[in-house]
């Protein structure tokens, strides 16, 4: 009998099957983690925008519907792939909405509720008011 070196076809098929099973389990988890990370980018930006809205309100006795006014106070520009808008603003209230194209849902921010998740999927159009 010869001294065989290397792997048999069966051994290689078993290794390929194990790799396929691991990929089937891990890939969906990685995609979900990416969506959660994208949502975190949105909530962090909205939290910053809330702080700058409060700063603006202290100086002007009213909230602003102009993102440029918040940027002039120090708010960073909108992150890549994030849609952000100040839907409404008055002396006592504001409504800001944001979502990431690779995220799960739209997020909103108001003085009463702070930053919160809406029930509207990011794949649908942006809400026109804070729910």
Swiss-Prot record:
Observed effect of gene inactivation: Deletion mutants show defect in both DNA transformation and twitching motility.
Propeptide: 1-6
Pfam families documented for this protein: N_methyl
Domain of life: Bacteria
Subcellular location(s) per record: Cell inner membrane; Cell outer membrane; Periplasm
Gene3D superfamilies noted in UniProt: Glycoprotein, Type 4 Pilin (3.30.700.10)
TM region(s), chain numbering: 7-27
Membrane topology qualifier: Single-pass membrane protein
SUPFAM superfamilies per UniProt: Pili subunits (SSF54523)
Keywords: Cell inner membrane, Cell membrane, Cell outer membrane, Disulfide bond, Glycoprotein, Membrane, Methylation, Periplasm, Transmembrane, Transmembrane helix
PTM characteristics: Found in three forms of 14-kDa, 18-kDa and a glycosylated 23-kDa form. Both narrow and wide pili are glycosylated.
GO cellular component: cell outer membrane; periplasmic space; plasma membrane; type II protein secretion system complex
Induction trigger: By growth in minimal medium or low temperature leading to a significant increase in pilA4 transcripts.
Disulfide topology: 95-130
Annotated positions of the N-methylphenylalanine modification: 7
Function, as annotated: Plays an essential role in the assembly of two types of T4P pili: a wide and a narrow that participate in natural transformation and twitching motility. Major component of the wide pilus that is essential for natural transformation working as a DNA translocator structure that spans the inner and outer membranes. In addition, participates in the assembly of the narrow pilus composed of the PilA5 subunit that is required for twitching motility.
Protein name: Type IV wide pilus major component PilA4
Lineage, uppermost ranks: Bacteria, Thermotogati, Deinococcota, Deinococci, Thermales
Gene symbol of the encoding locus: pilA4
């Amino acid at each position: 009998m010869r001294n065989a070196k290397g792997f048999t076809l069966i051994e290689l098929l078993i290794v390929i099957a194990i790799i396929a099973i691991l990929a089937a389990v891990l890939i969906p988890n990685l995609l979900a983690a990416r969506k959660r990370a994208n949502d975190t980018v949105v909530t962090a930006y909205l939290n910053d925008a809330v702080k700058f809205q409060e700063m603006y309100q202290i100086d002007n006795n009213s909230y602003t519907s102009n993102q440029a006014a918040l940027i002039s106070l120090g708010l960073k520009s909108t992150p890549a792939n994030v849609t952000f808008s100040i839907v409404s603003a008055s002396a006592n209230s504001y409504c800001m909405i944001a979502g990431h194209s690779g995220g799960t849902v739209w997020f909103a921010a108001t003085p009463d509720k702070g930053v919160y998740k809406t029930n509207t999927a990011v794949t649908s159009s942006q809400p026109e008011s804070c729910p």
